[in-house]
Swiss-Prot record:
This is dTDP-glucose 4,6-dehydratase. Its EC number is 4.2.1.46. One of its GO terms (biological process) is dTDP-rhamnose biosynthetic process. Disulfide bonds: none annotated.
Amino acid sequence: MMNILVTGGSGFIGSALIRYIINHTQDFVINIDKLTYAANQSALREVENNPRYVFEKVDICDLNVIENIFEKYQPDAVMHLAAESHVDRSISGAADFVQTNIVGTYTLLEVAKNYWHTLDEAKKTTFRFHHISTDEVYGDLSLSEPAFTEQSPYHPSSPYSASKAASNHLVQAWHRTYGLPVIITNSSNNYGAYQHAEKLIPLMISNAVMGKPLPIYGDGQQIRDWLFVEDHVQASYLVLTKGRVGENYNIGGNCEKTNLEVVKRICQLLEELAPSKPNHIKYYEDLMTFVKDRPGHDVRYSLDCSKIHAELGWQPQITFEQGLRQTVKWYLFNSSSS
């Protein structure tokens, strides 16, 4: 049994991770979260009274408070997810991204390093700092280029991805310089229950059922690799417990889709699952509206995940069709929880 400190555990991926740990292991979870607009405590309702779960409202940039958390709970591992993550918000206001994603990661690393030095040799050996990051640090690909591997250079395009690339570099530096036992994972686009409504899939679902336009950037031909959040958190825990210290692992769904394909499939599922439409709309696809493209919009993301497949035997279990159907159903019946 481990004491696992999860940062950003009230967010979309963090809450899914905590639910997975509580439901599938005997580990104790300390969730620290600042509770920004993207947090959703209802995503943790099923575990909030579990004796192996505790929540602390904390800003990861507050060094003294973070030190107290480490002292109080004596974590065996850190799973660092706390981050500002919406690309559009980073374009209109980058300061929060620099502060949380870079300064916050630095603060955690410093506290973790100092704490790690106080541990006995056995606990030092088993301690892990797992930094959960994004495929966007690699930049984008043309349609003909091979997928990104863990050796691909970083070439971020947005303030968001630049801040995550910087945080990855900090984590690697604390390993190289101080010996802190770290692991980094870079995942592709996640989707599933409890995702904030600003993201593509929940935005399209909520707009469609309200009869609002479905805004699609540019021509909608941007390609993303889609990963069901439950698959992601299972892989993340596997990397924490079985991955090699100092290594990076890509976690993807092996499922490349254009944004237009995704939106059209959502509309098709809604025709089946929510046939009663608002505002005398004939077809959900009639709501699709092409809008001015995002500045510096990446063309394609694709991850080569052969490393995690070969070393840890992990493969995604949920197909995009299964996951998207499950997600659409969830939003239709839980609109107040998203």
